[in-house]
């Protein structure tokens, strides 16, 4: 007889075959050779065995069948007719089979079929597609599918976002979906990864399922204890069904060995027990991550994940690990631009808050600030993120002219342009600043002309003397400098040319009334 095995190479001694007599008693059991031949020992007949002898040959189907193996149930009946002609014994052997198939699976009933055909079939390849999202909250829509259509604008969201994570447009995203959006240092992100078992069944011989998530360990902090898994059908927390680890920037979550059962084969192959770990659903993982304070301005924070399925293949007797990626997701920290100018004042010391300066963006005022005591002019930092990509902004800074007539104000208008782009090599948003050539506002203080005045002083004998006149002015004209001379010696004034009412230097009596007339000039 012969043995054929479809699906993989036949091994010597892999299958057993039994020869039985008409009474159903075992005569001999043998195994196949590597080339598929099945050979029993010769049967001998003597003069006492003249007549018809019937035997059957069947494959011995083991109590514990090999996974995926379809055994040939054919029973071949051998009829040996022994006859004697003179002193010579002759035999004629006929074979007829029942319940057998040929290598194409077609029935061979009633034919002289001497070939046992077995077939081993690998398990169906599991069909799955994991998903990945970046959210601003935990436990979002665990039992729903609101996020599924957030990438509908893409032809192939998996290949396109892995090539360029910014390919995802936000206009059709859920509000909780913050993929591609700008985040601040210290913000909490929630990476939600969906492990897909929707199309799995027992026939897949799945030994374990899990996800592998690669995160930017230099830019975000992830703690294994914070990671949770939820059943998308029941909404229950099923974290206890997974072994979760965080090592070297990679998060792994794999179904526990305690979720398995034996297939009952000779190798005691372990597969997932669907009474403990149900298929036909997503297992959604919430992975909280906090943006580190040390992230460089403009830096991309990328995240990607894969789903791995361990499948036992009885054909190769090996474990296969089909794997599929999720979408790649990205966030970025804003890039900042400082607009700083200086103020100088000639003519006197500059005071804090003395002058005002207005900043305009595209000719619209956005902020007005004052100088400090050192002349520094500092506007608030400008932040640029994903929404600014491809844009160029023009800023102008000018001094707000004051009303102090002693100050000459600088009428300079300083122009700064900022061009925002994404550097794919550096994986960062960059702002290219074209600064103003002159960033110093210069004012000059011109003091007023010193007022010219000369007060006068007289001693007269009457009040309201010559109030509207100037008769007294020439009373000291005999002096070269009446102010200096009289301050040194008030008797320097000679009375010969004084008005009669002018009593300066004259003798007066006790009780006399003098009138000091002072002229404010």
At which residue positions do the language-model features occur?
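Solvent-exposed loop/turn and edge beta-strand elements of beta-rich ligand-binding domains
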Residues: 1-521
């Amino acid at each position: 007889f012969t043995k054929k095995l479809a699906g993989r190479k036949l091994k010597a001694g892999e299958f057993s075959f039994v020869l039985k007599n008409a009474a159903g008693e075992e005569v001999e059991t043998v195994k196949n050779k590597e080339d598929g031949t099945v050979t029993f020992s010769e049967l001998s007949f003597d003069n006492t065995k003249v007549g018809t002898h019937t035997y059957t040959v069947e494959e011995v189907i083991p109590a514990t069948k090999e996974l995926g193996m379809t055994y040939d149930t054919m029973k071949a009946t051998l009829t040996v007719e022994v006859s004697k002609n003179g002193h010579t014994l002759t035999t004629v052997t006929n074979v007829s089979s029942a319940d057998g198939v040929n290598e194409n699976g077609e029935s061979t009933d009633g034919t002289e079929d001497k070939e046992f055909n077995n077939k081993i079939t690998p398990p169906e390849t599991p069909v799955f597609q994991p998903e990945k999202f970046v959210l601003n909250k935990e436990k979002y829509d665990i039992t729903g599918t609101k996020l599924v259509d957030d990438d509908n604008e893409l032809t192939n969201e998996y290949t396109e976002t892995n090539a360029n994570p910014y390919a995802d447009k936000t206009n059709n995203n859920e509000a909780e979906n913050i993929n591609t959006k700008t985040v601040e240092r210290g913000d909490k992100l929630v990476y939600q990864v969906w492990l897909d078992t929707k199309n799995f069944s027992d026939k897949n011989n799945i030994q374990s399922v899990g996800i592998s998530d690669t995160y930017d360990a230099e830019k975000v902090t992830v703690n294994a204890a914070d990671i949770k898994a939820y059943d998308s059908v029941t909404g229950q927390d099923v974290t206890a069904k997974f072994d979760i680890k965080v090592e070297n920037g990679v998060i792994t979550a794999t179904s526990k060995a305690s979720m398995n059962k034996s297939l009952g084969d000779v190798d005691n192959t372990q597969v997932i027990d669907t009474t403990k770990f149900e298929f036909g659903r997503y297992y959604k993982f919430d992975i909280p991550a906090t943006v580190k304070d040390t992230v460089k301005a403009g830096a991309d924070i990328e995240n990607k994940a894969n789903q791995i399925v361990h499948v036992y293949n009885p054909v190769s007797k090996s474990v296969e690990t089909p794997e599929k990626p999720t979408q790649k997701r990205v966030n970025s920290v804003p890039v900042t631009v400082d607009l700083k100018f200086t103020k100088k004042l000639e003519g006197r010391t500059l005071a804090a808050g003395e002058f005002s300066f207005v900043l305009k963006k595209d000719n619209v005022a956005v902020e007005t600030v004052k100088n400090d005591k050192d002349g520094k002019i500092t506007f608030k930092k400008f932040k640029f993120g994903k929404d600014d990509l491809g844009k160029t902004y023009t800023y102008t800074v000018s001094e707000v002219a004051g009303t102090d007539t002693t100050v000459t104000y600088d009428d300079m208008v300083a122009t700064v342009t900022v061009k925002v782009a994404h550097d794919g090599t550096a994986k960062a948003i960059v702002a290219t600043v074209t600064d103003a050539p002159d960033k110093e506002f210069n004012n000059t203080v011109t003091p007023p002309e010193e007022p010219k005045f000369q007060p006068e002083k007289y001693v007269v004998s009457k009040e309201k003397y010559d109030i509207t006149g100037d008769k007294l002015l020439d009373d000291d004209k005999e002096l070269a400098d009446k102010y200096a001379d009289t301050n040194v010696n008030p008797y320097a004034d000679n009375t010969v040319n004084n008005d009669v009412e002018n009593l300066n230097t004259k003798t007066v009596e006790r009780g006399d009334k003098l009138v000091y007339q002072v002229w404010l000039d």
